[in-house]
UniProtKB/Swiss-Prot annotation:
The keyword Hydrolase does not apply. InterPro entries: Ribosomal_eL44, Ribosomal_LSU_eL42, Ribosomal_zn-bd. The gene is RPL44. Belongs to the eukaryotic ribosomal protein eL42 family. This is Large ribosomal subunit protein eL42. One of its GO terms (cellular component) is ribosome. It comes from Trypanosoma brucei brucei. It comes from the Eukaryota.
Length: 106
């Protein structure tokens, strides 16, 4: 289980800032696939009509986890940086660190 803060202070490399600023952290999510991309149009054309499945469907999945990609947005200039973390099964964005009876600090 990886807990990560929703806000993080780090250096903003953008020429507008070029200083340590507060960043808002969001987990990256892949966008919706485009219906009219060249490969999708070709695939749909091939699939139409009689004949069933025309291309192999991949079943031999090798990995059990995905790498965590974070989108960090600067509070000052709104520029976005993407940051890749290691593989993990459970990932959470939290305001507070989960500790025993101690005070939560980042």
């Amino acid at each position: 289980m990886v807990n990560y803060p929703k806000k993080k202070k780090m250096h903003c490399p953008d020429e507008r800032c070029n200083a340590h600023k507060s960043f808002k952290v969001v987990q990256y999510k892949a966008g919706k696939a485009r219906l009219y991309a060249r490969g999708k149009r070709r695939y749909d054309r091939k699939q139409s009509g009689y004949g069933g499945q025309t291309k192999p469907i991949f079943h031999k999945k090798a990995k059990t986890t995905k790498k965590i990609v974070l989108k960090l947005q600067c509070s000052n200039c709104k520029s976005i940086i993407q940051n890749v973390l290691k593989r993990t099964k459970h990932f959470e964005l939290n305001d507070k660190k989960k500790t025993g009876n101690k005070d939560p600090t980042w």
